[in-house]
Regions:
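Extracellular loop and loop/strand-boundary signature of outer-membrane beta-barrel proteins
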Residues: 19-23, 80-85, 140-147, 186
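Outer-membrane beta-barrel transmembrane domain signature
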Residues: 110-186
Length: 186
């Protein structure tokens, strides 16, 4: 199409995340999935909401389960056997976004460079995966003392490319985002 359109859209996203600052002391890089609803106005204004969930962040923090280990460094399950526990980080980011689309790069005025800013909430915690026997200390209500749940406010800046094809069948976006959050233990 050769004219600028108002276009509401639901989108799914998939990507990777890199941790920095204090969060990098606790967990490493991981994956990310998300869903959002945004509206691109004729004028270039772009606004909406987005939810992202991070998973698979490698644990970096030492001594998370230190008080549950035997003198030999083993974790014992409810049956008295050595337990094998995988610990990863999980995150959640929920934002309301506003931005601007500069057209001129793409097949029509609905494609171009997209700059947006968002504000919302961010949380992160540790996830314990035990595929063997139960470990009572890593179940509710005790789990809350080990999962290191923190929650707080976040801001996000995103720069990317938004593409809307002429036939409406190949719409996509690619971007880089920088998120800054301040969180508190829960």
């Amino acid at each position: 199409r050769d004219s600028s359109l108002t276009s509401p859209h639901i989108h799914l996203s998939l990507g990777t995340t890199a941790t920095l600052g204090d969060l990098a002391d606790r967990m490493g890089n991981g994956g990310m999935v998300g869903i959002g609803f945004h509206v691109k106005q004729r004028t270039g204004l772009y606004w909406g909401v987005q939810a992202n969930w991070g998973f698979g962040h490698r644990l970096r923090e030492q001594g998370v389960l230190a008080n549950l280990l035997t003198p030999a460094g083993d974790l014992i399950d409810n049956e008295g056997q050595v337990a094998f526990v995988s610990i990863t980080g999980r995150t959640g980011l929920f934002t309301a976004d506003v931005g601007w689309l500069w057209d001129g790069l793409g097949p029509n005025p609905n494609s171009g460079i997209l700059l947006k800013a968002g504000a919302g909430s961010f949380h992160h915690r540790l996830h314990f995966e035990n595929t063997e026997k139960r470990i009572t200390q890593l179940e509710q209500p005790q789990l809350q003392y080990y999962d290191r749940l923190t929650w707080g406010v976040a801001g996000r800046l995103t720069l990317g490319y938004f593409h809307m094809s002429n036939d409406g069948l190949r719409n996509f976006f690619a971007d880089l985002s920088l998120t800054r959050a301040t969180t508190w233990p829960q």
